[in-house]
Amino acid sequence: LHALREVTSLTAAAAEGATWRQYLRLDDLVGLTSVGGDEFVEARRATARDVLIRMTNPWLTAEQKEFLTQPPLIALAQQIRNWAGGEVSIDTLAAFIERYESTNSNRDADAIAELRLRMKWSPDSQLQALGEELNRHYRNANMRIAVSSELMNRWIPPQEPVSAPVRSRIAGAEVRGQSQTETQITVRLLPDPTVWRFGLEAHGKVSSRTQSQTWPAKLRNASNMEYEVRKLMLVNRFGLHAFPAEANAEGDTRLLGVDSNLSAVPVIGSIVENVAREQHRQSRPRAVAQVKAKVGKEARERMDREAGARLAKVNERFREHVIEPLDRFALTAEPVDMNTTEERATMRLRLASEQHLAAHTPRPSAPSDSLASFQLHESVFNNAARGLELDGRRLNVAELHALLSQKIRRHAEAEPADLPRAAKVEFAAHDAVRVACHGDRIELILKIVELRHGRDSIRGVGVHAFFRPVVDGMEVKLVRDGTLQFDGAHLRTGPRMMLHGVFGKLLPKDQEMPVLTAKLSEDPRFAGLMVTQLVIDDGWLALSVGPATPERTAWRTRGVTTK
């Protein structure tokens, strides 16, 4: 590849040459150009695709993107597209799609995804267009989240009045006293067709009673200020962004009285008081301006400080509950679209790598009065299941229990006392784990090549566990429903008991998975709300929260249990 030599020379001269060389995997590309044979086709294809994806990474900075627009790099991308593509049979694609529509097999999904990638980097424009159609129809968003402004405002904890001492210097005088601040914080959604855009707004009042030490008397003052603080927030594909707060304060001060040791002295006391009042009148405009500036500055700093602390907690929870699980299961979260209206913020995501499919069935619509709604397609579970890396593996039950604990719960759980640790499980080479959302339940399917326990062995069996939703107020959880089911040849009583003895411990009857926690029902900020929709159908799990009324029940599938 001539372009590869030019890029190698270009990066050697660049300030970040070593980093670019590693990022673009130039050494790997050089190595693959020096070998031939069909046995290296897949290695070249995988490497070329990885490099092309890296070159179009949306996380690149503007400077990095500009570096990649240089002619040698454009030529390299064009040349390795030939490696990234491959032969495409439309008849084969049609057969895979037809079978996938009826079986939802992960193996068929992977085959369709592979053909899509070949078409994406094909030199044939018609195949490229067909690849885009596949991407649109079979890699649609598989997660949708919508949150209303009302719910965001419910989330904000009530602000208690704050009393604080006043120690300052205003208009050249030392001022001492006490102030009380009352604040109301609201969230205002700002319409935007491409991102989540909202403002934190604080409206507050500061009332103070102070004394200023001036010669020849002490002045007692009252101040009443009102302030507004606005802080712009953005959520886009790169994360959460907070802008500096802006503040404005208005108000006035008034003189309550003059105190002087000479007040009781005839004539002189009056003169002293008049002098003090005149000094106050002259300095009042400057004092009011300084008080306004001080109130605005403190409100602005308080908003930035408190919002910064809360956002740090949000980022930490987001990292713990979203980023880390995605990393554990080798998933990528790609926003398909985001938008904000005055009523709600909506985000559609695709949780999949380039090698995965995503949603391809119609998504349930949320009730129009929903304060929050959430829809999740079964492809999220199935793409995550690949991250378990169980296809074709053979391991004992103790190892399997530890692996599942680490992947799903991030820590090793204590084993059940009667876990058959030594039993060995060999999973199928394809579709070892699959999840289906249908018939009002979530079905977990395990394909087992062999289960061996001591001298006993069972081959070619499918394990089916079903989970149904249970609603209790604002709490929603999935519980295992009924007994485990098995399919396979010659499954008599003995083999079934053996299967129950192993998988009944890994998937216990009382197993529960929280969807919405009970804490929401106990939080007064969410009083008057209920689960208004819970649907599991056609590959989707859909959940909505909205206003509760005495006669209202959740719009749900018939298999939902309510308490």
What are these regions (language model features)?
Residues 224, 230-239, 244-246, 279-282, ...:
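Amphipathic, rod-like alpha-helical scaffolds used for oligomerization/assembly
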Residues 216-218, 260-261, 560-561:
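Short, charged/polar low-complexity linear motifs in solvent-exposed/disordered segments
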Residues 132-199, 204, 211, 533:
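Interfacial loop/beta elements and low-complexity acidic/Ser/Thr-rich segments
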Residues 161-168, 196-200, 206-210, 253-258, ...:
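Generic detector of short, locally flexible boundary/turn motifs and exposed helical patches
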Residues 2, 44, 235-257, 414:
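Short charge-dense sequence patches
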